[in-house]
Amino acid sequence: ALCGVSYQNQIGVDLECIRTMPDLESLARRFFSPEEYEHLCLISSEEQKQMFFRYWTCKEAYVKATGDGLVKLEEIKISLTKNQPSRLLVSGDWNLRELTPTDNFAAAVVVAGKNINLHCWEYSAFVDY
């Protein structure tokens, strides 16, 4: 599970298990920007799974923060480049952070505002429930 709490700012989180999806390419074509889709098509199928869920969790965390729902995900552009932090390419002041909670999972947190101090803690007390 993943939980996000903010006292003053809009916040959205998403967590997904990285898994094989037979319709991954068609979902990417439908919900990703042309640049994101092209980026996905240029990498190996194993890398595609991971990249797909990285894009997906970033987009979904953003729409959860804004409350806009899954409409027009292709208009929410994400920059995922090697050796640089992921970035939201949308209007307004939004902070995006990708998380890697465990192997085979992708997660993202999006918070509204500038100069946000984001703190993450792992709490495993619920594991036995």
Which residues fall in each region the model found?
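Core catalytic alpha/beta fold that binds nucleotide/phospho-ligands
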Residues: A1-Y129
